[in-house]
């Protein structure tokens, strides 16, 4: 039995600054709305180096000590696995600047639920970022419906 599968790795990083968190209002028409910065892991790149690079490209900040705190994953209709690595950190240097990916700013953490978020499941994604007893957000198909479990 062949256990290899096609996988695409991406990352997302929650950067905290006191009671505020860095958000990005993405302009990509395929995935618009407010989320955390992040992006694709390039071939040959370590996961940690990828999240540091993506945050720098999208925000102007250089993060350090990113902690892997969970994953989100699913299979698409072609049986291709998509894995989002969730990181968080409070360690950064540099000056905040927006990029072509979207505008970035510090937002009160408690205000996140009132913003136009990029995904309807962002509140449950936040649970994986924050709750130590959760580490996985897994989407699966049940007939024509997409469901998910938090584990």
What are these regions (language model features)?
Residues 1-21, 37:
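Conserved N-terminal beta-strand and adjoining loop/helix that marks the start
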Residues 62-70:
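A short coil-to-beta-strand element that immediately follows conserved catalytic motifs
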């Amino acid at each position: 039995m062949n256990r290899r599968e096609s996988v695409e790795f991406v990352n997302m990083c929650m950067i905290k600054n006191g009671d505020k968190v860095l958000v990005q209002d993405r302009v990509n028409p395929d995935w618009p709305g407010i989320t955390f910065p992040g992006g694709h892991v390039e071939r040959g790149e370590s996961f940690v180096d990828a999240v540091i690079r993506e945050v720098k490209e999208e925000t102007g900040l250089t993060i350090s000590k990113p902690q892997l705190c969970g994953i989100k994953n699913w299979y698409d209709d072609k049986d291709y696995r998509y894995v989002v690595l969730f990181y968080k950190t409070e360690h950064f240097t540099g000056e905040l600047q927006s990029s072509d990916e979207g505008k970035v700013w510090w937002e009160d953490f408690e205000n996140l639920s009132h913003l136009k978020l990029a995904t309807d499941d962002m509140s449950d994604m936040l649970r994986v970022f924050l709750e130590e007893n959760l580490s996985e957000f897994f989407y699966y198909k049940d007939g024509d419906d997409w469901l998910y479990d938090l584990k």
